C-alpha cells in the first residue's frame, strides 16, 4: 500500500459554511480537497459526533455530514478514516462527555449505545458506497471515554466499551482496521500504562494511534523527537 499522507478535515464543512474559500499559489480558487490532493495528500480523517448542534460555526460532524464528506474524498481517490468521539462535541484528554441522549443510561445501555452508534454510522457509509479503511474508537483516550463509566479508573468497563466499538466495526466489514488512540506520543510511560492495561482487559484493536504535538508539549521538537522514536519502536 502507498504510504499514508493525510489530514483531519473535520472542520472543512464549517469553514465552507462560514464563507471560506481556498486558493492555489497562483491565486486560482480551488476546491480544498483538490488543493490537498495536488500536494500529495491521499487520505482523510473525519470525526463523528453523536448529536451535534446545528450552528453553522460549531454544529458539524453529524452522521449525515460525515457520509457526505467521505463521499467527496472517495470520489477524489482518497482513503478514509472515521474517528468516533462518542460525544456531541469534542472529546479529548481533558473531556470525554457523554452524548446528552446517553447521559442517564446505565453501563449496560452505554455498551449498546457504542455498538449501535458505531454500526449505524458505518452502515450509512456502506450504503452510500464508502467503506473506510480505518476506524478509530474514541479520540485521544489516555483517561478513557464516556466518563465516568468508561474512565481508566475502571478499566474493566473501559475495555468492554472499546470492544463494543471493535465488534460493531468488524460486523460491518471485517477488513476495516480498528485504531485505539492516545495523545502525547513521546510519552512512553503513558502509552505503556494504557496499553498494558488494555492488554490485561483483552481489548481488541489492529493499530495503535498516537498524537504528537510539540506545540502542546511546550518544548522544541528536537527535545522530544528521540522519545517519540523510542515509543514508536516500543509499541
Give the predicted meaning of each segment:
Residues 1-79, 85-114, 120, 136, ...:
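N-terminal substrate-binding region of glycoside hydrolase catalytic domains
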Residues 59-67, 91-199, 203-205, 217-230, ...:
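Active-site cleft segment of glycoside hydrolase catalytic domains centered on the general acid/base Glu
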Residues 48, 180-182, 212:
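Short glycine-centered, acidic/aromatic-flanked micro-motifs in structured strand/loop junctions
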Residues 14-15, 50-53, 142-144, 214-217:
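A short, flexible beta-alpha/helix-coil linker loop
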Residues 85, 170, 213:
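Histidine-centered active-site/metal-ligand motif
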Amino acid at each position: 500500500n502507498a504510504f499514508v499522507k493525510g489530514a483531519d478535515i473535520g472542520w472543512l464543512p464549517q469553514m465552507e459554511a462560514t464563507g471560506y474559500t481556498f486558493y492555489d499559489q497562483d491565486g486560482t480558487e480551488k476546491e480544498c480537497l483538490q488543493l490537498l490532493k495536488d500536494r500529495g495528500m491521499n487520505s482523510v480523517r473525519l470525526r463523528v459526533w453523536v448529536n451535534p448542534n446545528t450552528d453553522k460555526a460549531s454544529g458539524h460532524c453529524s452522521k449525515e455530514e460525515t457520509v457526505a464528506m467521505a463521499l467527496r474524498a472517495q470520489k477524489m481517490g482518497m482513503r478514509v478514516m472515521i474517528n468516533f468521539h462518542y460525544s456531541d462535541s469534542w472529546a479529548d484528554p481533558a473531556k470525554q462527555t457523554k452524548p446528552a441522549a446517553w447521559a442517564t443510561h446505565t453501563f449496560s445501555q452505554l455498551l449498546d449505545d457504542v455498538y449501535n452508534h458505531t454500526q449505524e454510522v458505518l452502515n450509512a457509509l456502506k450504503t452510500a458506497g464508502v467503506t473506510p479503511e480505518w476506524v478509530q474508537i474514541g479520540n485521544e483516550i489516555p483517561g478513557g471515554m464516556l466518563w465516568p463509566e468508561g474512565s481508566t479508573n475502571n478499566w474493566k468497563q473501559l475495555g468492554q466499551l472499546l470492544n463494543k466499538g471493535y465488534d460493531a466495526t468488524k460486523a460491518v466489514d471485517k477488513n476495516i482496521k480498528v485504531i485505539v488512540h492516545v495523545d502525547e506520543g513521546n510519552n512512553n510511560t503513558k502509552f505503556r500504562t494504557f496499553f498494558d492495561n488494555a492488554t490485561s482487559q483483552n481489548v481488541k484493536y489492529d493499530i495503535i494511534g498516537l498524537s504528537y504535538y510539540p506545540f502542546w508539549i511546550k518544548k522544541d521538537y528536537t527535545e522530544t523527537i528521540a522519545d517519540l522514536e523510542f515509543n514508536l519502536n516500543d509499541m
